[in-house]
Amino acid sequence: MNAVVIAVLLMLVLSLLRVNIVIALIIGALAGGLTGGLGLGETVKAFTDGLGGNATVAVSYAMLGAFAAALTKTGLPDAMVEASVKLIGNKEDSRKKALSKVLIVLIILIVSCFSQNVVPVHIAFIPVLIPPLLKIFNELEMDRRLIACVITFGLTAPYILLPVGFGQIFQGMLKDNMADAGLNVPLADIPYALIIPVAGMVVGLILSVIVYRKPKQYETKDISGAEASPYTRKSIGIAVLAIVVSLGVQLYLSQTLGVEGMIMGALAGLIVLFVSGVMKRDEADSLITDGMVLMAFIGFVMLVAAGFSNVLTKTGDVESLVKTSAGFIGHSQSLGALLMLIVGLLITMGIGSSFATIPVITTIFVPLCMQLGFSPMATIAIIGAAAALGDAGSPASDSTLGPTSGLSADGQHHHIWDTCVPTFIFYNIPLVIFGWIAALVL
């Protein structure tokens, strides 16, 4: 049996059985490597060699956690909570409470979508924005699974559909790799071809709102490094300045210089808080350490996920899976489209990145689509949807690790059952259905 299928399924089954995701990824990597013929020594080497693949993101998260913890000293989180409580009003005022829920969901959705294009910081906003809002979610009895679905939608749908920010990178990769495989398509056609698959994600978002709209109670707990702090207009102003400086540095480094900006952005924000006197010298060390600990688990998962991905790549069974599936299709367009989408789902679930999936699948899928008689627009829809499938729902993807990092800050949100399973159901299933429809109608 294919090593990728075995590794991914084993990792998913163990995760669903509530085995720690780090352990599940390691066991899945070992099983995949041994099944793929690498041998124990080569498997372990491939795993350890790959650990550094997500090192930058892991360190970025640690720094952002430190920045988020330091922001608590300005009193900004408490000011946000007080303002929201005033907005909510009396607990018996159910209409006002419902409107507050809608407003918060819309704000989080807009911020998440903008993080992919308008202010392309990707997941960097989550550790700063979400932990302070947990008290508000508790006050409103909001189901955090809904928030996870909203954030994940914002992290994925915009880059699939819109040719700006991360979407420009995704669609540029799609065009270039399709051209390398023998099919030249205009860049301007790609968003139109992906409208139907993304419409499926919109349907999934609406369904998640319907399913998770009911109240759910959580215990209000103190977050490490987030004890209540008195605040003034000056301290709130400094907090806003620190956030603006942090975002400014990130955008300058990533957009102007073309380098990763999260680490230096978080550092710049910390410097503003330190120089302003909001963060005292005698408490800075413990505060920053507490913030880093807050994000440590997500960092470890990202590191191990990179090792897992490297093992699957080294087996050569990723390409083998694509070629084997092509042999089952025959001349059936409907079966071909469905199998290509499912193969894309399996690969992205294992690799944890839709961007990394594109080069793997285009080399086989483009000639196969041409052989089956699919139009260029249908081919774009199949490959785009196949690559995007699994980004939502994969335990190793930053599109799920990001939401979990913020929502689990008080230990009451499970990565697999509260983020991965809901996002898998509400986004991957509609994406398969609507991607399949797009392939047949375009």
UniProtKB/Swiss-Prot annotation:
It comes from the Bacteria. InterPro entries: AA_Transporter-Related, Na/H_Antiport_NhaC-like_C, Na_H_antiport_N. Coiled coil: none annotated. The keyword Ribosomal protein does not apply. GO terms for cellular component: plasma membrane. It is found in: Cell membrane. The keyword Transmembrane applies. Pfam families: Na_H_antiport_2 (PF13726), Na_H_antiporter (PF03553). It is a multi-pass membrane protein. The chain crosses the membrane at residues 21-41, 51-71, 103-123, 146-166, 190-210, 236-256, 259-279, 292-312, 335-355, 364-384, 421-441. Keywords: Cell membrane, Membrane, Transmembrane, Transmembrane helix, Transport. Its main location: membrane. PANTHER family: AMINO ACID TRANSPORTER YUIF-RELATED. This is Putative amino acid transporter YuiF.
